[in-house]
UniProtKB/Swiss-Prot annotation:
One of its GO terms (molecular function) is demethylmenaquinone methyltransferase activity. It comes from Oceanobacillus iheyensis (strain DSM 14371 / CIP 107618 / JCM 11309 / KCTC 3954 / HTE831). This is Demethylmenaquinone methyltransferase. Belongs to the class I-like SAM-binding methyltransferase superfamily. MenG/UbiE family. Its EC number is 2.1.1.163. Pathway: Quinol/quinone metabolism; menaquinone biosynthesis; menaquinol from 1,4-dihydroxy-2-naphthoate: step 2/2.
Length: 238
Protein backbone atom coordinates (compact mmCIF):
# COMPACT_ATOMS: atom_id res chain seq x y z
CA UNK A 1 0.00 0.00 0.00
CA UNK A 2 1.40 3.41 -0.99
CA UNK A 3 1.91 6.31 1.35
CA UNK A 4 -1.29 8.39 1.74
CA UNK A 5 -0.95 11.45 -0.50
CA UNK A 6 -3.14 14.02 1.23
CA UNK A 7 -3.64 15.09 4.83
CA UNK A 8 -7.16 13.65 4.77
CA UNK A 9 -5.94 10.27 3.51
CA UNK A 10 -3.07 10.21 5.98
CA UNK A 11 -5.29 11.02 8.96
CA UNK A 12 -7.84 8.41 7.87
CA UNK A 13 -5.03 5.84 7.65
CA UNK A 14 -3.80 6.79 11.14
CA UNK A 15 -7.15 6.40 12.90
CA UNK A 16 -8.17 3.27 11.01
CA UNK A 17 -4.99 1.70 12.40
CA UNK A 18 -4.83 2.93 16.00
CA UNK A 19 -8.54 2.64 16.88
CA UNK A 20 -8.23 -0.36 19.21
CA UNK A 21 -5.60 1.35 21.39
CA UNK A 22 -6.83 4.93 21.02
CA UNK A 23 -8.60 5.26 24.39
CA UNK A 24 -5.74 3.84 26.45
CA UNK A 25 -3.14 5.88 24.57
CA UNK A 26 -5.23 9.04 24.94
CA UNK A 27 -5.22 8.61 28.71
CA UNK A 28 -1.47 7.98 28.80
CA UNK A 29 -0.62 10.89 26.51
CA UNK A 30 -2.71 13.39 28.49
CA UNK A 31 -1.81 11.90 31.90
CA UNK A 32 -5.56 11.22 32.32
CA UNK A 33 -6.23 14.96 32.15
CA UNK A 34 -8.45 14.81 29.04
CA UNK A 35 -11.33 13.50 31.16
CA UNK A 36 -11.17 16.44 33.58
CA UNK A 37 -10.88 18.89 30.67
CA UNK A 38 -14.06 17.48 29.14
CA UNK A 39 -15.86 17.45 32.50
CA UNK A 40 -15.04 21.12 33.09
CA UNK A 41 -16.13 21.99 29.55
CA UNK A 42 -19.45 20.18 29.99
CA UNK A 43 -20.07 22.17 33.16
CA UNK A 44 -19.47 25.41 31.24
CA UNK A 45 -21.76 24.28 28.41
CA UNK A 46 -24.66 23.64 30.82
CA UNK A 47 -26.40 21.14 28.54
CA UNK A 48 -30.06 20.62 29.43
CA UNK A 49 -32.35 17.60 29.15
CA UNK A 50 -34.18 17.45 25.84
CA UNK A 51 -31.58 19.41 23.87
CA UNK A 52 -29.76 18.33 20.70
CA UNK A 53 -26.05 18.02 19.96
CA UNK A 54 -23.73 17.02 17.13
CA UNK A 55 -20.30 15.68 18.11
CA UNK A 56 -18.00 16.11 15.10
CA UNK A 57 -14.95 13.82 14.78
CA UNK A 58 -16.47 11.82 17.63
CA UNK A 59 -13.88 9.04 17.43
CA UNK A 60 -14.56 6.33 19.99
CA UNK A 61 -17.49 8.30 21.36
CA UNK A 62 -16.53 9.55 24.83
CA UNK A 63 -17.80 13.12 24.36
CA UNK A 64 -20.88 11.84 22.49
CA UNK A 65 -21.66 9.66 25.52
CA UNK A 66 -21.25 12.57 27.97
CA UNK A 67 -23.58 14.66 25.82
CA UNK A 68 -26.09 11.79 25.59
CA UNK A 69 -26.17 11.44 29.35
CA UNK A 70 -26.74 15.19 29.70
CA UNK A 71 -29.62 15.46 27.19
CA UNK A 72 -31.31 12.31 28.49
CA UNK A 73 -33.91 10.17 26.76
CA UNK A 74 -35.85 13.23 25.57
CA UNK A 75 -32.81 14.68 23.79
CA UNK A 76 -30.81 13.64 20.74
CA UNK A 77 -27.06 13.37 20.08
CA UNK A 78 -25.35 12.49 16.82
CA UNK A 79 -21.71 11.41 16.81
CA UNK A 80 -20.05 11.74 13.40
CA UNK A 81 -16.66 10.41 12.32
CA UNK A 82 -14.94 9.40 9.07
CA UNK A 83 -13.20 6.35 10.57
CA UNK A 84 -15.42 3.27 10.58
CA UNK A 85 -13.01 1.50 12.91
CA UNK A 86 -13.19 4.31 15.50
CA UNK A 87 -16.99 4.28 15.18
CA UNK A 88 -17.03 0.53 15.83
CA UNK A 89 -15.63 1.20 19.32
CA UNK A 90 -18.20 3.97 19.87
CA UNK A 91 -21.03 1.65 18.79
CA UNK A 92 -19.96 -0.97 21.32
CA UNK A 93 -19.93 1.65 24.10
CA UNK A 94 -23.38 2.87 23.04
CA UNK A 95 -24.72 -0.68 23.14
CA UNK A 96 -23.18 -1.38 26.55
CA UNK A 97 -24.71 1.81 28.00
CA UNK A 98 -28.04 1.43 26.13
CA UNK A 99 -28.03 5.03 24.93
CA UNK A 100 -30.99 5.13 22.54
CA UNK A 101 -30.68 8.90 22.24
CA UNK A 102 -27.25 8.53 20.59
CA UNK A 103 -26.92 7.99 16.84
CA UNK A 104 -23.51 7.27 15.29
CA UNK A 105 -22.91 8.35 11.70
CA UNK A 106 -20.08 7.74 9.23
CA UNK A 107 -19.50 11.15 7.67
CA UNK A 108 -17.15 14.00 6.77
CA UNK A 109 -16.58 17.03 9.03
CA UNK A 110 -15.84 19.12 5.93
CA UNK A 111 -19.37 18.55 4.59
CA UNK A 112 -21.78 18.00 7.47
CA UNK A 113 -24.93 16.25 6.15
CA UNK A 114 -27.37 18.44 8.10
CA UNK A 115 -29.57 21.47 7.51
CA UNK A 116 -28.71 24.92 8.80
CA UNK A 117 -29.68 25.71 12.41
CA UNK A 118 -30.22 22.05 13.42
CA UNK A 119 -28.47 21.62 16.81
CA UNK A 120 -28.31 23.36 20.19
CA UNK A 121 -24.64 22.34 20.51
CA UNK A 122 -21.93 21.25 18.11
CA UNK A 123 -18.72 19.87 19.61
CA UNK A 124 -15.33 18.70 18.38
CA UNK A 125 -12.78 17.16 20.73
CA UNK A 126 -9.17 16.67 19.62
CA UNK A 127 -10.34 16.45 16.02
CA UNK A 128 -9.99 19.92 14.54
CA UNK A 129 -6.21 19.63 14.18
CA UNK A 130 -6.68 16.56 12.00
CA UNK A 131 -9.05 17.99 9.38
CA UNK A 132 -7.79 19.20 5.97
CA UNK A 133 -9.07 22.76 6.47
CA UNK A 134 -9.76 24.25 9.91
CA UNK A 135 -11.89 27.16 8.64
CA UNK A 136 -14.14 24.98 6.50
CA UNK A 137 -14.99 22.81 9.50
CA UNK A 138 -15.56 25.82 11.79
CA UNK A 139 -17.87 27.34 9.16
CA UNK A 140 -19.73 24.04 8.80
CA UNK A 141 -20.22 23.78 12.56
CA UNK A 142 -21.41 27.40 12.64
CA UNK A 143 -23.88 26.65 9.84
CA UNK A 144 -25.58 23.70 11.56
CA UNK A 145 -25.78 25.13 15.10
CA UNK A 146 -28.98 26.97 16.00
CA UNK A 147 -29.07 30.73 16.59
CA UNK A 148 -28.25 31.16 20.28
CA UNK A 149 -26.42 27.82 20.24
CA UNK A 150 -22.81 26.98 21.06
CA UNK A 151 -19.96 25.40 19.13
CA UNK A 152 -17.35 23.97 21.49
CA UNK A 153 -13.83 22.77 20.72
CA UNK A 154 -11.32 21.08 23.04
CA UNK A 155 -7.94 20.79 21.39
CA UNK A 156 -4.23 20.68 22.01
CA UNK A 157 -2.72 24.15 22.17
CA UNK A 158 0.63 25.89 22.32
CA UNK A 159 1.85 26.26 25.94
CA UNK A 160 2.95 29.76 26.92
CA UNK A 161 4.77 29.05 30.20
CA UNK A 162 8.56 29.19 29.86
CA UNK A 163 10.09 25.76 30.47
CA UNK A 164 6.69 24.08 30.24
CA UNK A 165 6.66 24.77 26.53
CA UNK A 166 10.02 23.10 25.91
CA UNK A 167 9.06 20.08 28.03
CA UNK A 168 5.75 19.78 26.14
CA UNK A 169 7.43 19.79 22.73
CA UNK A 170 10.06 17.29 23.88
CA UNK A 171 7.35 14.97 25.20
CA UNK A 172 5.24 15.20 22.05
CA UNK A 173 8.15 14.85 19.63
CA UNK A 174 10.19 12.12 21.30
CA UNK A 175 8.27 10.37 24.08
CA UNK A 176 4.78 10.06 22.59
CA UNK A 177 5.82 8.20 19.41
CA UNK A 178 7.85 5.77 21.53
CA UNK A 179 4.82 5.14 23.77
CA UNK A 180 2.80 4.62 20.62
CA UNK A 181 5.26 2.01 19.41
CA UNK A 182 5.40 0.19 22.75
CA UNK A 183 1.68 0.19 23.51
CA UNK A 184 -0.11 0.53 20.19
CA UNK A 185 2.64 -0.80 17.87
CA UNK A 186 2.18 2.41 15.88
CA UNK A 187 5.28 4.65 15.89
CA UNK A 188 4.47 6.36 12.59
CA UNK A 189 0.86 7.01 13.53
CA UNK A 190 1.79 8.68 16.83
CA UNK A 191 4.51 10.64 15.08
CA UNK A 192 1.70 12.10 12.98
CA UNK A 193 -0.27 13.08 16.10
CA UNK A 194 2.67 15.06 17.47
CA UNK A 195 3.12 16.77 14.09
CA UNK A 196 -0.52 17.83 13.99
CA UNK A 197 -0.35 19.13 17.57
CA UNK A 198 2.84 21.10 16.87
CA UNK A 199 1.39 22.77 13.78
CA UNK A 200 -2.00 23.64 15.28
CA UNK A 201 -2.75 27.34 15.98
CA UNK A 202 -2.39 28.77 19.49
CA UNK A 203 -5.49 29.67 21.49
CA UNK A 204 -5.55 33.35 20.44
CA UNK A 205 -5.18 32.45 16.77
CA UNK A 206 -7.96 29.87 17.08
CA UNK A 207 -10.22 32.44 18.75
CA UNK A 208 -9.73 34.73 15.75
CA UNK A 209 -10.64 31.85 13.45
CA UNK A 210 -13.88 31.30 15.39
CA UNK A 211 -14.74 34.99 15.01
CA UNK A 212 -13.91 34.90 11.30
CA UNK A 213 -16.23 31.89 10.93
CA UNK A 214 -19.11 34.08 12.09
CA UNK A 215 -19.40 33.58 15.83
CA UNK A 216 -20.72 36.53 17.81
CA UNK A 217 -18.59 35.83 20.90
CA UNK A 218 -15.88 33.32 21.85
CA UNK A 219 -14.88 32.18 25.35
CA UNK A 220 -11.51 30.50 25.98
CA UNK A 221 -10.16 28.35 28.79
CA UNK A 222 -6.61 26.94 29.01
CA UNK A 223 -5.89 23.63 30.71
CA UNK A 224 -2.75 22.21 32.33
CA UNK A 225 -0.31 25.00 31.58
CA UNK A 226 -1.77 25.63 28.14
CA UNK A 227 -1.22 22.17 26.64
CA UNK A 228 -4.93 22.14 25.80
CA UNK A 229 -7.60 24.78 25.39
CA UNK A 230 -11.37 25.03 25.19
CA UNK A 231 -13.02 27.48 22.79
CA UNK A 232 -16.77 28.10 23.01
CA UNK A 233 -18.29 30.04 20.13
CA UNK A 234 -21.73 31.61 20.50
CA UNK A 235 -23.97 32.00 17.45
CA UNK A 236 -26.02 35.19 17.70
CA UNK A 237 -29.74 34.80 18.38
CA UNK A 238 -31.95 35.88 15.50
Amino acid sequence: MGKPSSKEERVHHVFENIYSKYDSMNSIISFQRHKSWRKDTMKRMNVQAGETALDVCCGTGDWSISLSEAVGQTGKVIGLDFSKNMLSIAKQKKQDLQLNQLELVHGNAMELPYEENSFDYVTIGFGLRNVPDYMTVLEEMYRVVKPGGKVVCIETSQPTLIGYRQAYYFYFKFIMPILGKLIAKSYKEYSWLQESAKDFPGKKELKEMFLNAGFDKVEMKSYTGGVAAMHMGFKASQ
